[in-house]
Amino acid sequence: MTDYLLLLVGTVLVNNFVLVKFLGLCPFMGVSKKLETAMGMGLATTFVLTLASVCAWAVNQFILVPLGLAYLRTLTFILVIAVVVQFTELAVRKTSPMLYRLLGIFLPLITTNCAVLGVALLNVNQSHNFLQSAVYGFSAAVGFSLVMVLFAAIRERLALADVPAPFRGASIALITAGLMSLAFMGFSGLVKF
């Protein structure tokens, strides 16, 4: 149990996918202008990333490795992620039309989020078992969502601030992301891998 807790804390804070591994930067910069959209993207990513992580692990363990097709991992994982996103979109549309309208634009964007593919590939490279893959996928998504919501809240405050003209827009956003990355480096001694 302690190993799973360390994996959770380590992935969310110490080895954050956005601020440490630099995966998922496109949605991080593009969808984080408003807090509501960041929360919607974070919620959708959490569900999809956890499910895709488990499905990719199962496909790797039960299909690719036994058949000696490990060289097809990346292509197969991309297909698995696309299927999971489509399945999620259909399930959400059927069960909760209100949630579908809220998350509708974000679900197709998750297919192109490199963090989802990164989690699937890192699960294989780190030889995680089923439960570790689920925890790793969930904690990567929680870390992604946490950073995205924090960044969106900061960007909303910056929109109201008196920022010098040369730093407005993408410049101040990148400076803020760098400062957040430095802040998260403070967690580096929290968990030793």
UniProtKB/Swiss-Prot annotation:
Keywords linked to the UniProt accession: Cell inner membrane, Cell membrane, Electron transport, Membrane, Translocase, Transmembrane, Transmembrane helix, Transport
Cleaved signal peptide residues: none
Keyword check for Cell wall biogenesis/degradation: no
TM ranges: 5-25, 39-59, 62-82, 102-122, 134-154, 171-191
UniProt KW Hydrolase keyword: no
Domain of life: Bacteria
EC number, UniProt record: 7.-.-.-
Localization per record: Cell inner membrane
Predominant location category: membrane
Pfam families given in the database record: Rnf-Nqr
InterPro entries assigned: Ion_transpt_RnfA/RsxA, NqrDE/RnfAE, NqrDE/RnfAE_oxidrdctase
GO cellular component, one term: plasma membrane
Membrane-topology descriptor: Multi-pass membrane protein
GO biological process: electron transport chain
Enzyme class: translocase
Function, in words: Part of a membrane-bound complex that couples electron transfer with translocation of ions across the membrane.
Matches recorded under HAMAP family: RsxA_RnfA
NCBIfam families cross-referenced by the UniProt entry: PRK05151.1, rnfA
Family from the record: Belongs to the NqrDE/RnfAE family.
Assembly and oligomerization: The complex is composed of six subunits: RnfA, RnfB, RnfC, RnfD, RnfE and RnfG.
The protein's name in its UniProt record: Ion-translocating oxidoreductase complex subunit A
Organism, scientific name: Edwardsiella ictaluri (strain 93-146)
